[in-house]
A protein has these predicted regions:
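A short alpha-helical cap/connector motif
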Residues: 1-117, 121-145, 149-250
């Protein structure tokens, strides 16, 4: 499908919301990876508000893919904007737990979503509940993105994520974090995303004139914690092990 980043920046510029540019470019690269590897599936966003991040999901969605957009407080202009971008969008003005309980046909979306963004209520219990929903809907090759991960304003979100990962280690793993987001995938598919980040992520950034702006950190060995971290550019594309910064092990 190709990068949608430039179009996203243009369309989202006037939309109120909180979505860092570096997070948007990371989404764009990961969604391009999915498209180039023929990974298809639906999209779920819990917490839409005015639609700033959902714009990027709608731009990447293929016509046959459904965007499920859930928010108790969803603005009419957001609904109109997103529907115009992707006509195959379903809107649910409710709490996420009510969406889960009341949508009679939700079973058709089980294990079908390739991209899920959790940005709903920010209590620990709400985040844990949303992860339960996401775990049911995520496909084998999909990604769950958690908003405000490692944000010191919401430590309960980070705690809820690690609590969930501890309880369900065979369901999800953290493979990437940074710029206010955490990224989870199925354990047996994480290696593919880790390899992409190591081998092609920065190439993709350079193709859309975004090189020299993000550094990937991999300061641990796979047996310790197999996850990349994203930071603003530190003069190099990668930082590896503390004992040898040139060594990246996945």
């Amino acid at each position: 499908m190709g990068s949608k980043f430039s179009e996203y920046i243009s369309r989202a510029a006037s939309v109120e919301g909180f979505f860092l540019e570096q997070a948007a470019i990371t989404w764009d690269c990961l969604l391009n990876y999915q498209s180039s590897h023929y990974i298809k599936g639906n999209f779920l966003e819990i917490g839409v508000w005015k639609g700033k991040s959902a714009i990027l999901s709608c731009l990447h969605a293929n016509p046959e893919e459904t965007c499920l957009l859930v928010d108790l407080i969803m603005f009419d202009e957001a609904q109109e904007l997103l529907k115009n971008l992707h006509s195959n969008s379903n809107f649910y003005r409710c709490k996420s737990q009510n969406f889960w309980q009341n949508e009679a046909n939700l079973h058709q979306f089980f294990s079908s979503c390739r991209w899920i963004h959790i940005d709903g209520a920010h209590s620990g219990s709400a985040c844990f509940n949303d992860l339960q929903i996401a775990n049911q809907l995520l496909s084998e090759e999909g990604i769950i993105c958690i908003d405000d991960f490692f944000n010191p304003s919401y430590p309960q979100v980070t705690a809820a994520v690690f609590n969930f990962l501890d309880q369900f280690p065979f369901s999800l793993k953290l493979f990437l974090c940074g710029f206010n987001k955490g990224y989870l995938a199925r354990p047996y598919y994480c290696d593919n995303y880790l390899r992409y980040l190591l081998e092609n992520f920065h190439n993709d950034l350079s193709m859309i004139n975004y090189s020299g702006k993000i550094t990937l950190y991999k300061t641990s060995r796979p047996g310790d914690f197999n996850c990349f971290g994203l930071r603003e550019y530190q003069g190099k594309d990668f930082v590896g092990l503390d004992e040898d910064g040139s060594k990246i092990l996945i």
